[in-house]
């Protein structure tokens, strides 16, 4: 999309520890390690939004992958792993494919609702939204709420 200069933007999660790293231990068995990821190529845009997750207000901070770095469209990375959040809220963006169902639903809520709120806050007006599988389904709910608000207040 970036190479073709398509008018697109991406939103994804910034996983503090990613999936996991593997290595073969001295005993010959596979060892799993969660190693904190650092991405110096992401820009802190000093923007955040708030999303309610299981009754807790969670601050969602955004970083941006600038289009020129990997010849992509702009991509915004969302994280909850910031000091303003509780330890539980920070863990929402720790691991990709977390086995805890409660965390997985929280991740989808942060990505979907937080993503829509961020894009609108920083000035994106969009006509089309692509949701990858059900992972960002809460985005559809956020858009529906906003549509009902505009219909009620404009017509």
Located regions from the model:
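Catalytic cores of carbohydrate-active enzymes across secretory and cytosolic contexts
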Residues: 2-155
């Amino acid at each position: 999309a970036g190479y073709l200069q398509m008018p697109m933007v991406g939103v994804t999660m910034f996983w503090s520890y990613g999936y996991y790293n593997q290595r073969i231990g001295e005993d010959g068995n596979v060892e799993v390690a969660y190693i904190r990821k650092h991405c110096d190529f992401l820009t802190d845009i000093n923007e955040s939004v708030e999303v309610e997750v299981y009754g807790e207000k969670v601050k969602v901070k955004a970083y941006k992958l600038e289009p020129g770095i990997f010849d992509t469209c702009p991509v915004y990375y969302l994280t909850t792993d910031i000091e303003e959040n509780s330890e539980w809220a920070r863990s929402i963006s720790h691991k990709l494919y977390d086995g805890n169902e409660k965390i997985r639903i929280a991740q989808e809520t942060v990505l979907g609702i937080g993503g829509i709120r961020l894009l609108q806050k920083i000035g994106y007006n969009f006509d089309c939204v692509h949701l990858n599988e059900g992972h960002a389904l809460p985005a559809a709910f956020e858009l529906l709420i906003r549509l009902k608000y505009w219909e009620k207040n404009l017509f």
